[in-house]
Amino acid sequence: MSDLVPLSRKPAPAAGGPAPSPAAPPRKVYVHTFGCQMNESDSDRMVELLGRHAYARAASADEADLILLNTCAVREKAEQKLLSALGRYREVKARRGALIAVSGCVAQQEKDRLLARVPYVDFVFGPDNIGRLPEMVERARDERFAETGWMDSEEYVFPRADPEAARGRVTAFVTAMKGCDNVCAFCIVPHTRGREVSRPFPDVVAECAALAGVGVREVTLIGQNVNSYTGGCTFADLLRRVAAVPGIDRIRFTTSHPHDLSDALVEVFRDEPKVMPHFHLPVQSGSDAVLRRMRRDYSVAEYLDRFDRLRAARPGIAITTDFIVGFPGETDADFEASLALLERARFEQSFSFVFSPRPHTVAAVRLGSAPEWRDVPREAAVARLERLLAAQRRIAGEILAGELGKVVEVLVEGPSDEPGERLGRTPENRVVHLAADEAAAPAGARVAVRITRAGGSSLSGTLA
């Protein structure tokens, strides 16, 4: 239940002044989102909720009456970015009287410290409290507060999305579940997102159908550990149900734990063409000793067995991953094992970072407590990360270069930043800049593209 008593529902002015009349221009909300796809989806839900209460999305904080910072707590650097951003928005508050709110995982974890350290933050709320945002804005006119309790109501855990808010988009996120029941030694997510809760599958399928009705062609099912889904069917069954929705051409999902990669899910990749050949499968380390300390519940051999079964079921599938470098006790040999795994797997992309101790996690508590938990010097960890990133850049470049001359399917998402170009993605989630105009490649169209250039992290091509 919530940490606070229910908020008053009495009629009251909106933030920053009297409630606008029906003819008055709407108040404006600016959302600064940090972190993962789940946060991006949560930010969209917040804007939709406020839109029902006479708020419109602001293009910049300078024109906002309400500034929301939706935060990430996975790494310490994300918290530092939050404090830096808050400093910039302080002037907007002084000039416009804007309310400032902090949401997301940092808010959940550090609510009291935020309110004490940053006196111009008006209210703080956790991920489970998004459904009460309009009420919290009302309350914030009168007092500062934090609302970070776990909510029992499904309406608050999974705020209903308004499909009209997605009109004009080609892709959309759809929440399938939230939370995580794993206890990885480095991860703060169970403390900030709570236990796993799966959204009933009819709700997920209905939202996908509604999105298809307004022109969305690709959906990404999201959750902290989405392939442990238990919302009335298995995750493999959920993918098949979404694939049956008319108008949905492509399906992706994130994020997954290797331990929960079932044979049934591998079969979906083999049998269902709407499920895209792209899988994010975090490994974290190539060392069994490090994986045991991380409490990842698999060995390198077990990870590679799942990896190889995916590749066999869907030849050409693009597999991406995560690495943590400099985890407590990591030796040079442990790191070399991670490099060897990267070379063996040839990941399409890896999101790699130096270990950052997070409050209340096993790794933070045990850091330095025994030889196997000794701290890795920062300089050594950074040097290892640079080697890993260099190897990944080389491999990614080789993969993209291998696409030269091929004809691939591209789902057009809209205009590119470059004049005269359109932007889209291949089934493997590779970004393609297409030399074509809107008439030849309208948003939502799937077009055949001949790849003519591979550079950086994207491809370029022409209509085939």
Curated annotation (Swiss-Prot):
Name of the protein this chain belongs to: tRNA-2-methylthio-N(6)-dimethylallyladenosine synthase
Compartments reported by the entry: Cytoplasm
Residue ranges of every copy of the Radical SAM core domain listed in the record: 166-398
Encoding gene (name): miaB
Residues holding [4Fe-4S] cluster 1: C36, C72, C105
Cellular-component GO terms for this entry: cytosol
All residue ranges annotated as the TRAM domain in the record: 401-464
Cytoplasm listed as a keyword: yes
One Gene Ontology MF term: 4 iron, 4 sulfur cluster binding
Keywords: 4Fe-4S, Cytoplasm, Iron, Iron-sulfur, Metal-binding, S-adenosyl-L-methionine, Transferase, tRNA processing
Cofactor annotation: [4Fe-4S] cluster
